[in-house]
């Protein structure tokens, strides 16, 4: 018997090694699979979910939640066994603070659970059938509220999860999500609900009868028309920008669009008349600061002068002069600095988000009305939050929670057509009241109840633009000799630079450039003409200076001449002269010389305020009349002496004759 060439112990060790190698290979395959799969599942939004229906039908134990929409494979991987399952979080939301926490929570948080009862899920495609990238499918899932565990009165977050595999295995992952809010039950009390409709638009006013563009022609038939009609409803208050009213009134009377140099007739006259008729039916309103400027930026920079200009401009719109003033920061925040700044305007109402929701509070700047600026915000995501369904769901949730906490009340700000449409939705738990009937908080406003500080949307660098614009207007009014006109121009245009309605700061800068174009002053605007060499031939010598006004408005200037030797020759400045647009005027000036000789001179133009305009002109004055005057004196003296001598001779010659005759 031949001996075994490989001992049994060694064979045993070899078998162990083979087993270990096989196990290691299996583990390696598993690791590779795990390494590959997460990359395909890494993006939970590989499948886009859009909810189109979210409603509860029925009551009590038979109430059913209906969710419907579409799912789209937006990834690059083919998916298998795609399913849409109902998801919900059974935590009842009963306050706005809890709602804010729910909105801030990650959509991938491990809260809530899926429901797999019949009807609560839908299979989009079975295992053998692939769901290719770009494919879209509809879905509808229904569940009883009792099965979902949504029974207590409150607001709940519900939605769907999309589950799928990247192969034909049973390894499923969540590849898409959508969430929204639903209300369950009915609050035991009604919420005092107020709405403030904001009537404002981007500035376009360039002066009497002229707008920079015709965007209002469309808005008066769309957004602004919807808003003014919304303001007629019970418990709704309006606040209008006097600049908007001025522009619409001007449109109704006939207007042009463009610039002072090039313009065409506007197209919104009929729409303006209709809108003004609608506005005339409103009552119980407020006015906004002229031009809807960013009050938070003014407060931060201490710009009290522009605040004053808003008051001056509003006074020019006499139809609205009796309306009380309503103010707010762009983010509806407030703080001590903001209130101190706007107190200068003496507002009746300050809209602000506070911890005393829906109530009014006394303050040094007027009554602070606490608002809910998020009333028309969107859904929780990760799906599209800016859809009609999500806006309605959020609107109902905010309103429902206000009713569950009736001491808070509910004040909403309406500024768009969609806001107006949502605000018109009837909610049984709301009691409509004007803001004047809101509950007064037990304590006055303080920093402790502020939700956040006031912040602006305009950049503070625009303050420099306003300063430069103001300087330009000063130059213009100095040249035109009309300080009152300067006050009007400043108030009409400067506050609008900080309007919160601009899409960008660059748009604000461009507007002011266009608005102030007619009031420009440059070196060539007023021209001087004088002879290069002027000779004084007598004490009463005058010489002309011609002044030409190339501007399209009258100017008032003085002619001023400086010389290289004021002691030898000086020229008094002229009286103030008015030169009409495009006209020329000759001004005669009278130099005063005390000695002969040539003197270098420069002629200037100055305004009544002493500001220099035009381009100075150099010339020479040659004074020769002083020598001639001396010779005239000598000759005259000689003539007088000769005359006296002749007279004396005659007197002497006659004297003897008189004696003889005696």
Language model region names:
Residues 2-3, 13-542, 547-548, 555-581, ...:
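N-terminal membrane-targeting/anchoring modules of bacterial envelope and secretion proteins
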Residues 8-9:
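Ala/Thr-enriched low-complexity intrinsically disordered regions
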